[in-house]
Every structure is written in structure tokens, then in C-alpha cells.
Amino acid sequence: MRIGNLFYEEKENGTFDIGFIEENVKVFNHQTYKLTCHLDKKNYQKFKKKIGSLDNIIKLFSDRFHVNEFNKFCNKHEIKYTHKVRIGD
């Protein structure tokens, strides 16, 4: 699902991706910048339990995906994730 710059996806294997996409970024020669945070199955279950509903994602992290708030939330609740950045289309 994508709302504003925020996207998230529940994968069939029980994992979860969340992040943001910024298009036409001047500093990157007008290319797309994409940050993806990946939660494995175990950590996604912890995440879902703590947020209550995926509908709360926007309330907690905004439709622009405030990654610092996401990081604080995950640290507070001992939720581990990996992240990757992609620049370009």
C-alpha cells in the first residue's frame, strides 16, 4: 500500500516492508530515492502487536514516513529490522 511517500507491504512469507519513496530528488540528479525497512517474521509479529492495526502506521509515522520515529518505536519495543536505500528508477 502506498499513501503519500509512505509504503508498506505484508509479504506472503510473513515478513513486512515499510519505507518511503521520494521522486525527482534534486541532490540525486532528479532520480528516485527509496528507503525500505524490512522486518523478518518474528519482528513483524512484535510490530503488529505493538501498533494494534496497520491503520495506525500513518498515525505513528506519518504519510511521509518519519524514519526517526520508526527507529525510536522499534528500539523501544526491541523490534529489529534491516534497511536498504536505492537511488534511481
Predicted regions and their residues:
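Residue-level recognition of well-ordered beta-strand positions that form the cores
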Residues: 19-21, 38
